[in-house]
Amino acid sequence: MVATGGQAQDQSQNQEPDVLNPTSAVTGLPQKRYYRQRAHSNPIADHSFDYPARPEDVDWRSMYPSIQQGQQVSFADVGCGYGGFLVTLGEMFPEKLSIGMEIRVKVSDYVVDRIAALRRRSADTGAYQNIACLRTNAMKYLPNYFSKGQLEKMFFLYPDPHFKRAKHKWRIINQALLSEYAYVLRKGGLVYTMTDVEDLHKWIVTHMEEHPLYERLTEEEANADPITPKLYQSSEEGAKVVRNKGDHFLAIFRRL
């Protein structure tokens, strides 16, 4: 039977969602090409965000369905990108809650969809219930989500270098923000930084060493941390640097 024009159009419309389906039929995971966005976002711009007035108002159960009474987020991956390192954290620390914070809407949507797909694929084991992602501006709203001394670890992996001097104030590491990070970090908590830009690395080290509430881990201490090897290529940006045979600059700091 030959389809009429109307029937052919209906069939085409019915097939279109399959063609545009952002989920891979092979892996069951979302495909990045449907979530592409510019590499960086202006953190000073007046983006429209919903954010809690205080940490007590955060509905963590909506992000972590299996959260236990009194359990809190322990790790924050600030600027988590496409979530590669966040997934690694979930696998390495199944008893800890990790949050990814990402300012770009399409990228954060991808991470949310990725986590949902991983949870469906691991329904029999209950894996990946301990990771979540939220779209927010960590440079403005971090204290709205975390209480004093709550976090054990914070990660700043391959942040935007903002090369122009006039934009250095946009860098995620600066003196004012370091005090906010110290507020939400517990004593002894760790800040992990990694970049492939040497100038930014020197900037980070200088500012953190000048701040009275941080001290840099020795090379021996950093190498003994089981997280350190994962910092190089667990994230998508890190893996790209490895593929391009680029340099990595690592610095880890302890909250005093």
UniProtKB/Swiss-Prot annotation:
Pathway as given in its UniProt record: tRNA modification; N(7)-methylguanine-tRNA biosynthesis
InterPro entries tied to this protein: SAM-dependent_MTases_sf, Trm8_euk, tRNA_(Gua-N-7)_MeTrfase_Trmb
Keywords from the named record: Methyltransferase, Nucleus, RNA-binding, S-adenosyl-L-methionine, Transferase, tRNA processing, tRNA-binding
Keyword Membrane belongs to the record: no
Pfam families: Methyltransf_4
Annotated stretches, region: Disordered: 1-25
Identification of the protein by name: tRNA (guanine-N(7)-)-methyltransferase
Naturally occurring in which organism (per UniProt): Drosophila simulans
Taxonomic placement: Eukaryota, Metazoa, Ecdysozoa, Arthropoda, Hexapoda
